């Protein structure tokens, strides 16, 4: 049996921008992508701590060490600059493997989205 489990989580990161006119996605600082094992184009779920919105989009790479977290396209309507969000991705795996699987968990500094 296959089940879906949390693979990666960037917990409580601050939105730095919202670009309604971009074609879609979420731009994430490359350092955060690498630390969380999320790849460009991967589907991610977003939970907005400030307003309770939950939605999905896909990740694109932002500049390294920029702290950028920008929601693009229609998703830009779901956030405001300064909102705190959680970014999660999931993976399917065998039920037995899932019992011991450990997700990548990242806890950035909410002030500048750094890992310091």
Curated annotation (Swiss-Prot):
Highest rank taxon of the organism: Bacteria
Post-translational modification as stated in the protein's UniProt record: Is synthesized initially as an inactive proenzyme, which is activated by self-cleavage at a specific serine bond to produce a beta-subunit with a hydroxyl group at its C-terminus and an alpha-subunit with a pyruvoyl group at its N-terminus.
Presence of the UniProt keyword Lyase in the record: yes
SUPFAM superfamilies for this protein: ADC-like (SSF50692)
Cofactor note: Binds 1 pyruvoyl group covalently per subunit.
Swiss-Prot/TrEMBL catalytic activity: L-aspartate + H(+) = beta-alanine + CO2
Protein name: Aspartate 1-decarboxylase
GO cellular component: cytosol
Binding site for substrate: 57, 73-75
Disulphide bridges: none
Subunit-structure text: Heterooctamer of four alpha and four beta subunits.
Cofactor(s) essential for the protein: pyruvate
Family statement drawn from the similarity comment of this UniProt entry: Belongs to the PanD family.
UniProt keyword annotations, A-Z: Autocatalytic cleavage, Cytoplasm, Decarboxylase, Lyase, Pantothenate biosynthesis, Pyruvate, Schiff base, Zymogen
Main location class: cytoplasm
Active site: 25 (schiff-base intermediate with substrate), 58 (proton donor)
Major enzyme class: lyase
Protein task: Catalyzes the pyruvoyl-dependent decarboxylation of aspartate to produce beta-alanine.
Record GO terms (molecular function): aspartate 1-decarboxylase activity
Organism: Flavobacterium psychrophilum (strain ATCC 49511 / DSM 21280 / CIP 103535 / JIP02/86)
InterPro entries: Asp_de-COase-like_dom_sf, Asp_decarbox
Pfam families in the cross-refs: Asp_decarbox (PF02261)
Subcellular location: Cytoplasm
One BP annotation, GO: pantothenate biosynthetic process
